Regions:
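Ser/Thr-rich, Proline-interspersed low-complexity disordered segments
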Residues: 4, 8-15, 19-64, 249
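Extracellular carbohydrate-recognition regions
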Residues: 47-84, 243
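Short tryptophan-centered beta-strand motifs in secreted/extracellular beta-sheet-rich domains
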Residues: 67, 130-132, 193-203, 207-209
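Extracellular glycan-recognition surfaces and repeat-rich motifs
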Residues: 73-110, 114
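Secretory/extracellular carbohydrate-interaction modules
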Residues: 105-174
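Short, aromatic/His-centered strand-loop micro-motif at the edge of beta-sheets
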Residues: 176-197
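Short, solvent-exposed beta-strand-to-loop segments that form ligand-recognition rims
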Residues: 211-230
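Ligand-recognition surfaces built from glycine- and aromatic
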Residues: 224-249
Length: 249
């Protein structure tokens, strides 16, 4: 009797296991589909030399930086161009031979819309041209700084094409936090996820701006006579710089 009962129990379990699932359960199983995650876009190498770099033929090279050597970041001075608490200070890093604006410092690492710059050079630099390649992964603001001293500076700023703000190209003077637009151009901005070149030249009271090798604006202003050069963006993250060149006449 015990053996017969065991056989019956075994056959019952086998039938239950082999029986097809109810149609409702099968439909539910069909609905469980894992999403396909697209691969992270890779950043192509920056052209070398950068296409569109503008520099006088007889110029003296002050800086040439490709961020491919140890200590490259230590040659630059990181400055937050607006007052922010210590935990919201901007973070810049060198990754795979590029200078990257990398949001804000740990532990928060949050994006922030405040303005930030990486500066290089001496306070007595007066006449020079700075050029750089840049690649925007997801930021929307880029620029170059000239004659930075004690918080005052000139800036050539470009806004990404698909961003709402207009005009897209501006030469600005910033003195003690007050921004004055010296020249503007309502032309298309730059395209994201491709390498572009930006150039800013200061010579006496003449300020000239170039984008991808084409002149965009020229204006005269005599308020600021000397100071460091630099790279500008916002602490949103995702802005890469490479092939920085600074020359003097």
């Amino acid at each position: 009797m015990i053996i017969a009962a065991s056989v019956v129990l075994f056959l019952t379990i086998a039938l239950v296991i082999s029986a097809p699932a109810p149609s409702g359960q099968a439909e539910m199983q069909d609905l469980i589909v894992l999403p396909t995650v697209p691969p992270t876009p890779t950043v192509p190498p920056a052209p070398s030399p950068m296409i569109g770099v503008v520099a006088p033929q007889a110029a003296t090279t002050l800086v040439t930086e490709q961020f491919d050597t140890d200590g490259a970041l230590s040659r630059w001075r990181i400055v937050d161009l607006e007052d922010v608490p210590n935990e919201r200070r901007s973070l810049w890093t060198v990754v795979e031979g590029r200078l990257r604006q990398d949001r804000t410092v740990p532990p928060l690492r949050d994006p922030s819309i405040h303005e930030t710059a990486a500066l290089i050079g001496a306070a007595d630099w007066s006449d020079y041209t700075i050029s750089a390649g840049f690649y925007d992964q997801d930021n929307a603001n880029v620029g170059l700084i000239a004659r930075y001293r004690d918080g005052s500076y000139y800036r050539y700023r470009i806004i990404r094409s698909d961003y709402e703000d207009r005009p897209k190209h501006l030469i600005e003077r910033v003195v003690d936090g007050t921004v004055t637009v010296l020249a503007s151009l309502d032309a298309p901005g730059y395209e994201a996820r491709r390498w572009n070149t930006i150039t800013f030249s200061v010579n006496g009271n003449q300020l000239r701006a170039f984008f991808n090798g084409q002149a965009t604006m020229e204006v005269r202003d005599a308020h600021l006579s000397s100071g460091s050069a630099g790279l500008y963006t916002r602490a949103i993250g995702g802005m890469l710089f490479d092939h920085v060149m600074i020359t003097s006449p």
